[in-house]
């Protein structure tokens, strides 16, 4: 028999293919439409990893752990932070971009997410295509600070000191391309200061280098230095906001110091790899909104140093 004979093909198809009427197609379409929501009801079915592209004790790490704890409490499932530091956050962002888009790997991104493509020759992610945004979760101003042995009490005194001794001083940041790094570079250019940048893999180790006295000057976000300033291990000279920060009112602003053009902040945002099911994105959005709107959440974040 010639199995390719069109008459045989038509006859076999009629014998073995069930008749599907309009009701069958509507039922099938309805079942398919329920699949994403049913799948989301079981999400997450294993621990969820939140990648932070910087070392522990920096703002992204602090926010990531705060958020992970509350997501775990609300869902009864495990959300954990994994620090993947280096290259101004590029290592972590690249790893998150390549992760399976199933909702079990997320990214706690910061301002470097949009800055780095303009600073580096190449980055391991496409900021427009590789991620699906879930929610903005926080924002924090920066702080200019020094080791207590540096005999200055204000940002103006610090810039005068650096100008008087060109090339002598270095300053630290959480990494090249961070907003704090760019803020200091802007200050250097506007005042003609000669000062060397020492980048670290995160605010935590950068701050510790100043606490130890290894480096004299630093600039990073408020959450990374807040308690160290309160404890007298660092001296804060100015916060880069228009008004004094509610939980650190003793720190003057850059506006008060005469540097109004130095206002800046770093944001944190939760993201998922592109292609993550829409039902999972919606679920996470609802959970994050509920967490941020919960009684006492705003006060907790302000105390940590976030807006």
Task: Pin down the residues of each PLM region.
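N-terminal secretory signal peptides and thylakoid transit peptides that target proteins
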Residues: 15-32
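Short, Lys/Arg-enriched N-terminal segments with co-localized hydrophobic residues
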Residues: 1-14
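Hinge/capping helix and adjacent helix->loop/strand transition within the periplasmic-binding protein
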Residues: 98-103, 118-205, 254, 267-300
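A ligand-binding cleft/hinge motif common to bilobed small-molecule-binding domains
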Residues: 113-122, 188-190, 217-251
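N-terminal signal peptide c-region/cleavage motif recognized by signal peptidases
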Residues: 35-37
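N-terminal (or domain-start) structured segment
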Residues: 39-128, 168, 176, 193-216
